[in-house]
C-alpha cells in the first residue's frame, strides 16, 4: 500500500472517529442536547427581524375600511407600517426553523444554523468515496429535520403564542430597539439566562476556544486538497462505528 493511499485511509478513519467521539460525549445527558429558552428566543427574533427587513422597503399602500353612506373614505396605510405586514411575517415563522441544521462542531447557540453542518458534509463525502457510514436511517432521510430542530420549532410556536402581544407592541411602538433585545432580554428571559444572545458566528472555525490562524487554515486546505486528489482512486468500502444523526 503506497504512502498516499495509506494517508487517505488514515484521514477517513480519523474523520469518522472524530465525529463519533463528539457524539458519544453529548449522549451522556440528553437534556443538554435540547435547545434552551434563550436559543429559541434568539432564533425566533432573528427570523422575524429578517422577514420584516425583507419587506420593509415596500412602497405599497393599503386601503383599509369600507366606504360608508356617510361618505367616510377608506384609510390609506403604508404597507411598511401596517398590521398586515406583521401578520404576514408571523405566518409560518416557526416553520422556517425547520430550515436550520444542528452543527455539532460549533458551541452554544451557534450550534443552530441554516445549511449543512460540517460533520454531515464530511460524512456525505465519505459515502461518495465508498465508505460505509451507518446513521441508523436511510441515506435519503439524512437531510430531514432532526429531533432537536423539530423541538426548536415547537418551542418557537409556544413562545410566539405566549408573547405575541409583546411582539406587536415592539412592532408598533419600539422598532428603534432590536427585537432580540426588546423581546428576549426585556420580557422572555431572566438576566442570568441571556448569555446566548451575545454569541456571534464569525465564519471561522473554533478549536479549543481559539480561532485558527490564517497559516493553519491554509495548511489544512492544502492537506485536504491532497487527500481529495488521492481519494478518487479509492474503491474499497470500509466499516465504521454506527453514528447518531442527532449530533450531525
Swiss-Prot record:
Signal peptide extent: 1-21
Main location per the UniProt record: secreted
A Pfam family hit: DUF3456
Cellular component GO terms, alphabetical: extracellular region
The keyword NAD belongs to this UniProt entry's keyword annotation: no
Subunit structure: Interacts with TLR4.
Protein name: Protein canopy homolog 4
Region (Disordered): 200-248
Organism phylogeny: Eukaryota, Metazoa, Chordata, Craniata, Vertebrata
Lineage top rank: taxon: Eukaryota
Record function comment: Plays a role in the regulation of the cell surface expression of TLR4.
GO process annotations (BP): positive regulation of protein localization to plasma membrane
GO MF term set: signaling receptor binding
Homology family: Belongs to the canopy family.
Keywords attached to this entry: Disulfide bond, Secreted, Signal
Disulfide bonds: 38-196, 41-184, 94-156
Amino acid at each position: 500500500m503506497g504512502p498516499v493511499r495509506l494517508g487517505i485511509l488514515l484521514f477517513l478513519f480519523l474523520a469518522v472517529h472524530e465525529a463519533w467521539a463528539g457524539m458519544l460525549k453529548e449522549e451522556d445527558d440528553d437534556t443538554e442536547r435540547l435547545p434552551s429558552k434563550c436559543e429559541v428566543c434568539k432564533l425566533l427574533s432573528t427570523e422575524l427581524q429578517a422577514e420584516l427587513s425583507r419587506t420593509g422597503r415596500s412602497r405599497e399602500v393599503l386601503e383599509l375600511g369600507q366606504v360608508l353612506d356617510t361618505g367616510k373614505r377608506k384609510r390609506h396605510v403604508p404597507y411598511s407600517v401596517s398590521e398586515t405586514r406583521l401578520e404576514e411575517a408571523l405566518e409560518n415563522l416557526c416553520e422556517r426553523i425547520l430550515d436550520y441544521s444542528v452543527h455539532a462542531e460549533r458551541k452554544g447557540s451557534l450550534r443552530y444554523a441554516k445549511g449543512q453542518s460540517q460533520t454531515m458534509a464530511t460524512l456525505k463525502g465519505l459515502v461518495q468515496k465508498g465508505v460505509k457510514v451507518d446513521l441508523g436511517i436511510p441515506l435519503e432521510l439524512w437531510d430531514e429535520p432532526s429531533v432537536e430542530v423539530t423541538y426548536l420549532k415547537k418551542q418557537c410556536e409556544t413562545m410566539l403564542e405566549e408573547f405575541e402581544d409583546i411582539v406587536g407592541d415592539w412592532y408598533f411602538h419600539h422598532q428603534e430597539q432590536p427585537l432580540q433585545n426588546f423581546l428576549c432580554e426585556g420580557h422572555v428571559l431572566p438576566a442570568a439566562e441571556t448569555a446566548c444572545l451575545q454569541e456571534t458566528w464569525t465564519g471561522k472555525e473554533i478549536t479549543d476556544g481559539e480561532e485558527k490562524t490564517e497559516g493553519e487554515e491554509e495548511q489544512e486546505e492544502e492537506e485536504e486538497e491532497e487527500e481529495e486528489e488521492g481519494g478518487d482512486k479509492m474503491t474499497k468500502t470500509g466499516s465504521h462505528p454506527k453514528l447518531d444523526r442527532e449530533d450531525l
